[in-house]
Amino acid sequence: PVVDSLTNPIFRKEIARDWGGGNSIIGDFQQDVDRFGNTMNSFMKQCCRMAKLYGSVFVFVDNDRTIEAGQKSAIEKRQYPYLYVIKPENVTNYKCDSSGVIREIEFKCGSTYSKSFAGYKVMMDTDTWKWTPTDWQVTRHDGVVEKGKNNLGFIPVVPVFGTEHENGDLLPLSPMISIARTNLTIYNLSSELRELLRNQAFSILCYPVTEGVPIDKALSSIKVGTNDMLLFDGEVGARPFFIAPEASQAQLLQSEIQRLIDDVYRQASLSSVTAVETKASGVAKQWDFENTNQVLADMAENLEVAEKKIMKYWSAYFGEEIDYKVIYPRDFGI
């Protein structure tokens, strides 16, 4: 829910996109940007969610190796540039110049899997791509299997950042690290609470043993628990009764879990959008909203910059520039 709350408001309203409307290839591309049927809007939403989770992701603008001339043929055979996402964990090496421009990048892509006897997927091989402004190559365990010239003169990869970063640092830490650690603590506490409720929260029947019945013999087959009785040497007139542990231990765990849940939303700058009822002044609530709005606006700006660069690289494959405009929202009030 935290990542969704930092993603969905950005795409709540339709993103304004315009490229003049005269290029049919762009319109067709916008409806299927990755050859999996995802529109530009849904693709950028996926990038937003992944960037928040990982700190950054990389959008690669690739194309078929052999292209037939003519827009009609390109549309019919879907032979125009497409997009795919590279997770930061698959980036094995990169180099940037003093301006922050990527001059070299290596990443893993196109893994081959096989099913084991137990039914699990086992990775058999993977391709390692290396791109520079002048060429590219693909290597596997047995060496280079494919290579070619990069006629663009630059590497068509666009980083999408989900957090603040230094220039040239393409792999910043995820903003969700502290939240993930807190969630792990919540998971462990919830497990302890469940164990406590299962073993202790049910009353135990205490039953008096009448005079003349050996108490040791009666207890030999009894285990203390919710499915057994606890026998005791009863006096005349003693009545059965139930005992139960104090609820204070469970209440302590519940209050700590709730405190950590509130802290998760605080760390994510989402205190103003949670349903937790707290006593706060109007000024304090306004500050919370401004903080949340700024976090969303910063992410929206990152997406806007990335999408413009994606379309710039996309049009470079055709050797032309397009007047592509996109505007992401900056105000997320209700």
Question: Model regions: which residues?
Answer:
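Extended, helix-rich architectural segments
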Residues: 1-83
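Conserved aromatic-histidine-acidic binding/catalytic patches
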Residues: 3, 7-12, 32, 47, ...
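Extended, charged amphipathic alpha-helical segments
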Residues: 145-282
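Extended, regular secondary-structure scaffolds
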Residues: 48-168
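Long, hydrophobic, amphipathic alpha-helical segments used as structural scaffolds
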Residues: 44-48, 63-65, 194-204, 208, ...
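Short amphipathic alpha-helical segments
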Residues: 25, 35-43, 51, 178, ...
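C-terminal helix-loop subdomains that flank or include functional centers
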Residues: 226-233, 252, 256-334
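Intrinsically disordered, low-complexity boundary segments flanking structured domains
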Residues: 40-49, 69-73, 78-81, 88-96, ...
